[in-house]
UniProtKB/Swiss-Prot annotation:
One of its GO terms (molecular function) is metal ion binding. Binds 1 divalent metal cation per subunit. Mn(2+) is the most efficient metal cofactor, but can also use other divalent metal cations such as Ni(2+), Mg(2+), and, to a lesser extent, Co(2+) and Zn(2+), but not Ca(2+), Cu(2+), and Fe(2+). Its EC number is 5.1.3.-, 5.3.1.-. Gene3D superfamilies: Divalent-metal-dependent TIM barrel enzymes. Homodimer. The gene is iolO. Substrate binds at E155, H185, R214. This is 5-keto-L-gluconate epimerase. High thermostability and very broad substrate specificity of this enzyme make it a potential candidate for the production of rare sugars for the food and pharmaceutical industries. Belongs to the hyi family.
Length: 270
C-alpha cells in the first residue's frame, strides 16, 4: 500500500481536504512529509495549467493517483443524474475533461458527489440515469478508469454503501469502473466494515482515510488496525489517500499526523 494526500485547486469549496489552495505548496508539503502521491480535487480542469502540474509532478517525483470531480456538483450544480438533460450532458462533458487530465498522469477519476442526489425521485429512476451516464462516459473515453465512492446519508441519498456500489457495478459491467471506499463514510453507513471490504474484493480500486471525526487518522476512535488487516487480507496494494479536515492544528500538522499513523500501521502489516 502506498500513501497519498488529497489536495485541491484554489477554488475548492469542500472542507474535508488536508490542503486547499496552491497546488505547488500542496504537492511540496506531501513530498516533504513523505507521501508517495497526491490526489487532486478540481472543479473545472480547463482552469488549470496541467502541463505545469505535470512538470512539477516529475520534478518532485510525486505521481498523481486520482482526480476528484465533486466540486463540479458543489460549485456548479452539475450531476450525472440531474433530471434536466442539458445539465446532465454538461456534467458528462465536464467529467470527460477530468478524464483527459487523468490520462496525462495514469490517474483514476473519482465519481463521488458528481453523481448527484435523488431530489425526490425514486432510487430506481436515479440509478437508471446514473448507469446511462456512466455507460456514456465509458463510450466517450477509451482508457479512463473510474471509481464510484459510496457517501454517507448526510451528503447524498444515492449510493451510500459498498453493496449499493457493487449492485451498480454489476449493471455497468466494466472493469474500468471500481469502488472507492472511505473510512469516514463507512463508519456511518456500513454494518460491518471488514466484511463490506471483503465483498468489494478485487473491485476495490482506491481507498480514502479520515478518522471518525474526519480529523487526521489517529485523532479519533476509528479502528484502522482492523481495516488495514482486512486490506492486506484481500490483497489491496493500491493507494490509500488521506482526505481529512485540516485538524488538528492546520493543514501541515494534519498531514504529518496522518502520515505517521498510517505508516506505522503499514509497517506492522509487513
Amino acid at each position: 500500500m502506498k500513501l497519498s494526500l488529497v489536495i485541491s485547486t484554489s477554488d475548492a469549496a469542500f472542507d474535508a481536504l488536508a490542503f486547499k489552495g496552491d497546488l505547488r505548496k500542496g504537492m511540496e508539503l506531501a513530498k516533504r512529509v513523505g507521501y508517495q502521491a497526491v490526489e487532486i480535487a478540481v472543479r473545472d480542469p480547463s482552469i488549470v495549467d496541467w502541463n505545469e502540474v505535470k512538470i512539477l509532478s516529475e520534478e518532485l517525483n510525486l505521481p498523481i493517483c486520482a482526480i476528484g470531480t465533486g466540486q463540479a456538483y458543489l460549485a456548479d450544480g452539475l450531476s450525472l443524474t440531474h433530471p434536466n438533460d442539458e445539465i446532465r450532458k454538461k456534467a458528462i462533458e465536464r467529467v470527460v475533461k477530468h478524464t483527459e487530465v487523468a490520462g496525462m498522469f495514469g490517474a483514476l477519476v473519482i465519481i463521488g458527489l458528481v453523481r448527484g442526489r435523488r431530489e425526490g425521485r425514486s432510487y430506481e429512476e436515479t440509478e437508471e440515469l446514473f448507469i446511462e451516464s456512466m455507460k456514456r462516459l465509458l463510450e466517450l473515453t477509451e482508457h479512463a478508469k473510474f471509481v464510484i465512492e459510496p457517501l454517507n446519508r448526510y451528503e447524498t441519498d444515492f449510493i451510500n454503501t459498498i453493496d449499493d456500489a457493487l449492485r451498480i457495478l454489476r449493471k455497468i459491467n466494466s472493469n474500468r469502473v471500481g469502488i472507492l471506499a472511505d473510512t469516514f463514510h463507512m463508519n456511518i453507513e456500513e454494518v460491518n466494515i471488514p466484511e463490506s471490504l471483503k465483498r468489494a474484493g478485487e473491485k476495490l480500486y482506491h481507498f480514502h482515510v479520515a478518522d471518525s471525526n474526519r480529523w487526521a487518522p489517529g485523532c479519533g476512535h476509528f479502528d484502522f488496525r482492523s481495516v488495514f488487516n482486512t486490506l492486506k487480507e484481500i490483497g489491496y496494494n493500491r493507494y490509500v489517500s488521506v482526505e481529512c479536515l485540516p485538524l488538528p492544528g492546520g493543514m501541515e500538522e494534519a498531514a504529518e499526523i496522518a502520515f505517521k499513523t498510517l505508516k506505522e500501521l503499514i509497517i506492522k502489516l509487513t
